[in-house]
């Protein structure tokens, strides 16, 4: 699986302007790649609904870019499945918690899925710990709700739960492992071909993502690792 993007979804900033020259370079590079390697899956854009919140005009340009690129990729490698990636919590209208807003289903963004009718699949990142304090708060249809809005194949390309959170959002390794069990249970009926935990080891990034690894730098075995691997 390969996922490529030309913007920072957190800031809405482009890596470089999407002018005629860079657009052509992106298209030619992507087509050349799938011709050469025929990947099973290739994605373009990461958390594009978050990108839209920051840069709505550039989001519309991305929608057009995806529509232009899709048939060229399928012509070059017909069996490659082409997709884009959404941020699930924001799609659901969950903007509260560590996002700093409010959880309000009326703010859901499910309609954005319709901007990509050609996509072979739709992918999501999911970090419920940013909006909920315990995995037990996740309703039974937390992931199955996706099926109410698309019949396409569904991928989970990022997932995570932190072991250490800011004040008021404390967690531990037991809670992290509990989320993994919940994630498996609540996605079972979706049968996602891809279900990915974001970090094997704790990354050197901002709180709270810095303790989302299945392992820290000095560990070879944790409750989260046991839950993920079934060992």
Q: Each predicted region: which residue ranges?
A:
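An active-site-proximal structural segment forming one wall of the substrate-binding cleft
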Residues: 13-44, 58-75, 103-118, 177-190
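Aromatic-rich peripheral "rim/lid" segments of glycoside hydrolase catalytic domains that contact
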Residues: 12-15, 166-179, 186-231
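Surface-exposed cleft-lining segments at the edges of enzyme active sites
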Residues: 15-18, 48-59, 92-95, 124-136, ...
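Active-site groove signature of glycoside hydrolases
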Residues: 28-59, 83-88, 193-202
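Surface-exposed amphipathic alpha-helices with a cationic face
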Residues: 63-81, 86-88, 143-151
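Aromatic- and acid-rich polysaccharide-binding/catalytic face
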Residues: 30, 37-40, 44-46, 84-86, ...
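Catalytic-core region of carbohydrate-active enzymes that cleave or remodel glycosidic bonds
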Residues: 133-193
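Aromatic-lined carbohydrate-binding surfaces of glycoside hydrolases
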Residues: 1-13, 46-50
């Amino acid at each position: 699986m390969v996922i490529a993007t030309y913007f920072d979804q957190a800031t809405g900033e482009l890596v470089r302007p999407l002018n005629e020259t860079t657009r052509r370079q992106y298209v030619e590079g992507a087509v050349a790649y799938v011709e050469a390697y025929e990947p099973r899956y290739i994605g373009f854009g990461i958390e594009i609904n978050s990108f839209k919140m920051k840069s709505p005009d550039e989001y519309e340009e991305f929608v057009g870019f995806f529509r232009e690129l899709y048939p060229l990729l399928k012509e070059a490698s017909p069996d490659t499945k082409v997709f884009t990636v959404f941020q699930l919590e924001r799609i659901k209208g969950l903007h509260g918690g560590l996002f700093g807003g409010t959880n309000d289903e009326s703010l859901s963004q499910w309609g954005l899925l319709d901007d990509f009718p050609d996509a072979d699949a739709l992918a999501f990142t999911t970090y419920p710990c940013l909006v909920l304090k315990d995995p037990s708060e996740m309703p039974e249809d937390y992931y199955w709700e996706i099926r109410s809005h698309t019949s396409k194949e569904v991928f989970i390309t990022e997932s995570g739960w932190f072991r250490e959170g800011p004040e008021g959002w404390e967690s531990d390794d037991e809670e992290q492992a509990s989320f993994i069990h919940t994630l498996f249970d609540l996605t079972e009926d979706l049968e996602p071909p891809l279900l990915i935990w974001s970090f094997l080891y704790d990354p050197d990034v901002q709180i709270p993502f810095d303790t989302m690894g299945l392992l820290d730098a000095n560990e070879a075995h944790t409750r989260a690792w046991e839950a993920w691997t079934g060992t």
